[in-house]
Every structure is written in structure tokens, then in C-alpha cells.
Amino acid sequence: MLCWMPALGQISGKTYFGFDRNEYPGDNLVPALHRSFSYAGYWLNNPPESNSNGWTGKRAILKANGFGFMILFNGRLDTQLTGKDAAALGRSDAADAISAAKREGFAPGAILFLDQEEGGRLLPEQSAYLFAWVEAIRASQYKPGVYCSGILVPDGSSTISTARDILSHEGKRPLALWVANDACPPAPGCVLPKEPLAPASSGVRDALVWQFAQSPRRPFAHRCAATYAADNNCYAPGTSHSPQSFLDLNVSSSADPSGGR
């Protein structure tokens, strides 16, 4: 059984719930989703393992229904970087992200998040790619952000998360982080709690967004498995359980984390 909090995703303490998923849910489902969520993930290019992007051209309908945005560009996996000029690919992909953001109508100053799918400490080629992308966005009319894991993993005699690795490189330079940490705890599972849920609980103090539940449920979330549906996915309230309606859950101190309205 899923436990949900009604009404627009806003709870006390000025935090807001949002959703993301790889496939666009369909125009008909957008109003129902806004009853629970204030913002949506918005892909600028093909999402992971997809050959097309159903989000293209959907900014207007989402905005008309009151949604803010988390603007996302699908980055490259390590296998796509090994043996190549990773920094050059980062700059080229940043240029593609900038062009796509302009085409979709996102104004200057919006945050573009790079989707860094693989967790742990960045390998040299991953680091070269990611930071070249970040610097190219930083030099444009947009602001850089990264979607990455906040889950600690073994790193020699210590532990590391992708988020901490990135922050140690960036120092005090501004970089928005959308942190994925669905481990229970700190994540509550597939619920929208009545109590304020702080992005800092992701394990990254200055996280702009915390993704705290994913579909399908991962082993990290086994302690809160009962909060997910029987098929191990997470669904929005008031929607049927279907391939069009499972999603990931996020919380932020902003109702428009990317400033995309």
C-alpha cells in the first residue's frame, strides 16, 4: 500500500515534491500528476536506453499545468568514453545541450543537469568528460548542474560517493547537484511524507534536489520495499498502475529547481 500526501507537492518548511521518468507520461496524465507534484524532469536528448525523446516540445503543456522543471541532458557511459577524447566529447555534448535548451524555450540562467548515471569515484575519462561539460555550460548563458549518486561505496580503505567526488573537484565554484540516494534510510521509500523532507538528507548538505525513490525499486531500498507497489515500481496517487505512470520521486526547496518556467 502506498502512502501519499495530497495537494501540489508542497509541505511545511517550503519543500516541494517532483517526479521524473525516462518516457513522457502523456498529455492526458499531466493534470493528475500536478495534483501531487510541483515540477518534472525534462530531457533535452534521448533518455537512457531510448531511441527517441518524448519530452521534446512538451515544455508548454507542462508549464500551462503549473509545472516547474529539472532540465536534464543524458551524459555518456564510461564505455562510450574509453579510448576517446572525453573532454572534447564533453564540450560537444554541452553545445548540444545548450542548443536543445534554446529550442525548447528555456530562458538564459536556467540550470541544465548532466545525467551521470554511473556511481562511485569518477574514472579519469569520466572526470574529463563531466568537467568539460560543466565548464562549457558555465561559459554559456545557462548554469551547470549534475545528476549523480549520493550513495557511499567502498573506495580503497574509505568510502566515496559521486556527489562528494564532484564537490571535492569543484571546491567553492557554484554547481547545482541533483542527488540520487534511494537507500532506506535515509530515504523514506515510495512515500510523500507529511513531515518536511530536506534535500540535505540525501547525504549532500547543499543538494538542490534529492531523488529518494526510483522505479523499479533497487536493492538499496529493500528496507522500505513495502512502500512500493507489488511490481516494485513507484506510482503517483490518482493514476492507474501502468507503464506510462511509474516514476521516480524527488524533493527540493524550489518548486522550479532548474528555473525553467
PLM segments and residue spans:
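Aromatic-lined carbohydrate-recognition surfaces of secreted/lumenal glycan-active proteins
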Residues: 140-157, 209
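Acidic carboxylate-rich catalytic motifs and surrounding loops in phosphoryl-/glycosyl-chemistry enzymes
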Residues: 74, 148-152, 214
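Flexible, glycine-rich phosphate/dinucleotide-binding loops
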Residues: 49, 78, 153, 216-218
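Substrate-binding cleft of extracellular glycoside hydrolase catalytic domains
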Residues: 11-140
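N-terminal signal peptide c-region/cleavage motif recognized by signal peptidases
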Residues: 4-6
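Functionally critical loop-and-helix segments that line ligand-binding/catalytic clefts
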Residues: 10-23, 30, 163, 167-261
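Distinct, well-ordered alpha-helical segments
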Residues: 124-126, 155-166
